[in-house]
Structures are given as C-alpha cells and as structure tokens.
Amino acid sequence: MDSAQNFFLTGCASGIGQHLADRLLANGHKVWATDVNLPALTRHAELQHWPEERVRVRQLDVRNAEAWDAAVNEAVSELGSIDVLMNIAGYLWADKFYEMPAEEVDLNIDVNAKGVIFGTQAAARQMIKQGHGHIINISSMAGLVPIQSLAIYSASKYAVRGFSLAAAQELRPHGIFVTVVCPDAVETPMTARQRERAEAAILFSSPKLLTVEAVGDAIIRRVLTHRPLELYLPIHRGLLARLTDLFPSLAFPLGPLFAKRGRSHQLHMRKDAKAS
C-alpha cells in the first residue's frame, strides 16, 4: 500500500476508528471519517488539525441503510472511488441476556450486525462498478466463542464474522477482498465503561487489554498489505477461542476461570485508578 488511497471509516469519534483515521491521514491518504457523534468527531478533527484537503467529517448512523447509501454516494462523488471501507463502529453493554432491555438488544444487533451489513452492501455496489476494493469488518473474539454475560454482543459479532466470510466468497470474483478482524478486548472508551460492572468481568480476563495502537498496526501493516480473509488479535487467544467454539462444552469449566481472572484485573484497575 504505497500509493495514496481513498478510505471510508465509521466510528471515528473515539477508539480504533479515531486512531486509524489519524494514522491514515498521517500516511497521506484521503479519509471519509464518520460517526454518529458528530460533535465529538469534529472536536477531534480540529484538535488534531486534520488536513481539510484530504478529509471529510460526516455524521452517519450506521443503523440506517438509506443513510449509508447517501454517504457512499457523496463520498464517491467527491473522491471518485472508495478503495477501502472500514466498518469499525460498534456497541457493547455486558449483562445477563434475560435481564437486558429490548432497546439494548436492538443497539447491539443494529449497530454491530446490521450496521456492518448495510455498510458492506453500500460499498460493495460501488466497488463492483470500480472492479476493485477492500472491505474490513471488525468482529471480536466474542465472534469466535460464546461469552457469558455477552450473549447478545456475541450474537452480533458472530453475525459479523459469518456475514463477512460469506460476503468474501461473493465479492472475490469482482476483485473485492473482505477481511474480518477479531480482536480481544481493546482499551477504548466503550470498554472503559464496563470496568466497574461485574457482568463484564470476562472482558478483562486477558493480562492486558489490547491498545488501539496495536490494533491499528495490525490493520495497517498486515490487513491492508496482505488482505487476509480473517485475522485474530492476538493469535493465541484467537486459537483458544476457536478451540472452545469447536468444543462448546469447554466453556463451562473455562468461562468461570476467565471471569475470576477478569474480576481480579478489574480490582487492580480500580486500585490503580484510585492511586493515580
């Protein structure tokens, strides 16, 4: 990926999307940066002095298929093409599935699953005309293995992964690549909101959360360069997740162990926060 390309990103007001927008602009690319939270996105763009000649900041609710079509059409009319779509916007709230309000179920499914589907549809229609393109969809380790207290989130991320793998088969004959990225828990504002919640303990079972920088490095250096069908971050956690998915009964003994480890990490995080 030596020459400048046109990127369309969602979820750019914070977290992975924000970091990737910063990196891509620093590398000389053109970026169509979107988020449902336009004020936060605009503030970041101004603070980071995003180059106006290579970036456009737009509001986009990924749950709205018509909004997607309008956004892609506007981007193409100005940029001429969309070389890479990154579906990054996501939503997470840990809770027992039987206690989760309907509106929380809707947010998980609509943002995480339908948002990716609508975005991939809109971009694919344009990329088929172009004869090339790369679609990168962010799933999760929760899309590889079912996780207690994240049943609805897991369902949405399983949907992202399954859809992406199937879409890749349909789009490859048109010269379009699809990559699904499955990261472990990442240190983002969305994850930070779960730190105090007992239901979210398993999110913090890894000794250290992934950073947005680590995820960004993997996407820029590996995904954009090699266009793999699937990427696990980190690979050893991904392989463990696949093993548990292959033998689902393993989740019964392993789940409580990971949750216990996560609670311990949450406690240390709270102590560190108080100390600072």
Describe the role of every protein-language-model region:
Residues 2-32:
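Canonical Rossmann dinucleotide-binding motif of NAD(H)/NADP(H)-dependent dehydrogenases/reductases
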Residues 27-43:
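Conserved glycine-rich Rossmann-like NAD(P)H-binding loop of the short-chain dehydrogenase/reductase
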Residues 96-97, 101-106:
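Substrate-binding pocket helix/loop in short-chain dehydrogenase/reductase
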Residues 120, 156:
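Active-site helix of classical SDR
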Residues 125, 169-170:
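Alpha-helical segment proximal to the catalytic Tyr-Lys
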Residues 140:
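Residue(s) in the substrate-gating loop at a strand-loop-helix junction
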Residues 173-235:
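SDR active-site lid
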